[in-house]
Amino acid sequence: MLRRLLLSVLIASLAACSSGNDRAQAPARPRGSAPITLSGPPSRATQACFADLAREDVRSSPLPDRDYGGGCAVIGAVQLIDFGVPTTNLRAMTCPLARTFVAWVRNGVVPASREILGSEVVRVESMGTYACRGVVGGSRASNRLSEHGTANAVDIAAFVLADGRRITILRDWRNPDPAVNDFLQTIRRSACRRFGTVLSPDYNAAHANHLHLDLGRGPFCR
């Protein structure tokens, strides 16, 4: 019953964020509240996603469902352990986000680095996933919960190649080297085909140092 009630509150809060109402919504529990662990089995969709990861040889660990207040929650999430390309700072990710992220790195980023840069990506550096906060940047930012608040987004800062090069979003987004520029534009296009929203330094100054990838509303690719 508690799980059902909290999920209803969460759904209502997220619906309000996407309704076009610019006024801040009053959450049932304030942000920063002590987390509440929700009991009950994962949904069928989440169980199917877990199975997809296992079938794709992705090692992951399911995480307990938790409500953090203020619309922030981690539901149907995993911790990625090993999918072939080490990635830093990954914490809770919704299972669909984890599945999409793995596919992007394996089928978009790694082949692009090999074909365009002549060296394979051996490590991805992220700036994290879950964070209970509002959207950063934009006139209505403070009124909207970020997809990070539901572990449905990941920020990517850099890629390390087998030959030792480190390609960063901050330093290399407008790199005059045509190969580096081609690589970054190629992986952004690849991300835009997979994620709901992709935000780059071309979007605003708040994204100058990373690619924001999420499975929220979209498609939106900048």
Regions found by a protein language model. Give the residues of each.
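Active-site-adjacent substructure of cysteine-protease-like catalytic cores
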Residues: 115-151
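Active-site acidic/histidine clusters and adjacent loop/turn architecture
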Residues: 41-125
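Proline-rich, low-complexity linker regions of envelope-associated factors in Gram-negative bacteria
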Residues: 18-50
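Catalytic cores and adjacent binding grooves of peptidoglycan-active enzymes
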Residues: 22-25, 110-113, 142-222
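Second-shell loop/turn segments in exported
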Residues: 34-40, 91-100, 143, 169-178
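Bacterial N-terminal signal peptides that target proteins for export
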Residues: 1-9
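Sequence contexts marking disulfide-bonded cysteines in secreted/extracellular proteins
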Residues: 18, 48-50, 71-73, 94-96, ...
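C-terminal motif of bacterial Sec signal peptides marking the signal peptidase cleavage site
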Residues: 13-16
